């Protein structure tokens, strides 16, 4: 890490999924300076990482959408009751653009350390790129932000390809002529 100046914000949000995007919008509306630190190269959280074939929400799409703005509700039309991953990702990108939130998101900036100093009532946050100081640190990382990699005896000796839903490759996968095992 370069020896740079500590950047100060009223609030730091870790994660640019649905919760992080909402927090950034609300904090800005309160007049607070805030930034999202996002380890991925785009927003979406779960809906960015989980792009495996057939990924979709398990509740009605309308319930998944933000309820804080009636105009937003009226301008977005879900194509099906239980939307697939690409449409959900398109929706959250629409929200970020509509409310001009992208300038408050630092992409490819994974938090490596967050320390609260009680005597100062401040958080000190470090990433591979920057150091930050803030009064409020909101962890909007969600319960699916860390892949659950199985640990089987002999797995380290397996020479084939291992794919997980939580880290599914962006490019299309071809399983023709391959032996495939599905676990879980």
Q: What does each model-found stretch correspond to?
A:
Residues 1-11, 29-30, 58, 90, ...:
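Extreme N-terminal leader/targeting segments of oxidoreductases
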Residues 6-36:
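N-terminal Rossmann-like FAD-binding beta1-loop-alpha1 element of flavoenzymes
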Residues 9, 32, 135, 177-179:
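Nucleotide donor/acceptor-binding cores
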Residues 19, 41-42:
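Conserved Rossmann-like nucleotide-cofactor binding loop
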Residues 33, 48-91:
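Glycine-rich active-site loop/strand segments that organize a redox cofactor
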Residues 43-48, 146:
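A short beta-to-alpha transition loop/helix N-cap that caps and shapes the active-site region
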Residues 71-78, 84-88, 141-184:
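Glycine-rich dinucleotide-binding loop and its adjacent helix/turn
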Residues 78-145:
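Feature captures the FAD/FMN-dependent oxidoreductase FAD-binding
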